[in-house]
Structures are given as C-alpha cells and as structure tokens.
C-alpha cells in the first residue's frame, strides 16, 4: 500500500494569508494542505480568486513550502444555473495546484434536476483533468441530495460515473442529522457505511452542547474519530483533518464565525495534537490488521 496522505485543511487558518498557513503547517510537520474556499466558512472571495495567475502564485507558494496539495475544498450547490462555469474554473485552479480530489456539496433537493444535468458535464471535465469530484455531506441541517450515507450511495448509483465519489465528513453529520432526532444517524457508523464509496474523507471532531456545536482537536469531541481512523487504515483512502476553530454552529446548525482569527499558537497546538492522534490510531489499526 502506498504511503497514506494525511492532509490538514486550511480552514482553521481562516483570516491568514496562504504563505502564513503553509509556514505554520510546515512547523507542525505537516506534509500536505487542503486549501479551503467555502462561502460563509472562510474569508469572503469571488471567482477572481481562481484565475490562472492566482493558481500560478499558489503553486509557487506550495513549491517553496515543500508541502503538497492532494485535495481541495470549494463547496457550491452543483444544481445552480451557473455551476458548470463556476465549478469548472475551480477545478482547473485545483488541478494546477496538483489536487487529485476536489470536494464540494451536492445540491439542495430543490435543485435536483439542475444537479443531474450539471454533474454530467462536470464529471467529464474531472476525467479530462485526472481528478475526482468528492461530494460532501453538509452540516447546516438543510435538505440536501446527500444528507446521510444512504443518500450519498444512492446518488452515486444514479450518477454512474467513477469520477464522482463521496467525501464523507462525520463532523458535519452530528449537526446536520443529529442522532437524537427523526432521520438522525450515528456519525461514525454512517461514516463507515459511506467509506467504500469514498474517494476521500474528512476527519473532524465536534462537541455537541445545548448552545450549539463546537469544533475540537481530534479525541476531544463526541465523534468516534478513532473508529473512523481504524476503519480507514484498512483502505487506501487519503484523508484530511479539518478543524475550523474560528467557527461554531448554533443549535440550528448554522455556522457562526468569530470576529478575529484564531491565534497561530492555538492552531499549531491543536493541529499537532490531532495529527498525532490520527497517526497513532492509523498505525495501531494497521498493526492489528497486518496492513503494511
């Protein structure tokens, strides 16, 4: 088995310039970064962020840092009328950074027809780029085409294209479909159900409380991240650790951003602890399973 890539999402560094992100991640011993462009979850941006010139600059920064880019997050509703032009531009940008997976939400259920029209075109473009589109389950409680693993599996069956797979995030499930409510699921169990259908997966821990959902370093929340990592060890999937620590979700699952970025020292401590947690559980599981 090839060496597994464990990336760190750039989402925790909301408010930092990309060279600062890379410098900090390198100081933590990280090998790969997953850039994140997500409306409402990161600093505001528009499509001018994804020009060939911007991609060239990002690629230079990556090269200078020594970090790689295997996955890229840039979520939109793929059922939008402009989704093909917007997402193709973002796919081109990600490909220029070396990304093999681009993660996005699927679509609101009301945009189902547009989604199925658009995904045909987007899947062909992904194939031309040698890239896989990773459909990610959302966390905001809305009605999406991909609310739970079963939805995602059925969606892939309907799409029928190997360039479209899942990117399951159990840290989204806990707020999107809480186990205590009708239609809710256990986040870790649902992640394991989705895993055979994934091109990638996010490892994210969340503490649920009366006043909302709070992102934590791995092992400090209510997601059984250890179980997900143990299952991951038996596959050839790569993954990202994602800790959007500038955010929390309100009780209604809507994201709330703090006014100021998280201090670098806090981020580096959380990243170092979480990376060690992930590597420890992957290694233990691999030894137990006899995986090289």
List each language-model region with its residue ranges.
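Structural motif corresponding to the early beta-alpha repeats
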Residues: 31-120, 124, 128-132, 172, ...
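Histidine-acidic metal/acid-base catalytic patches
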Residues: 1-10, 14-32, 59, 63, ...
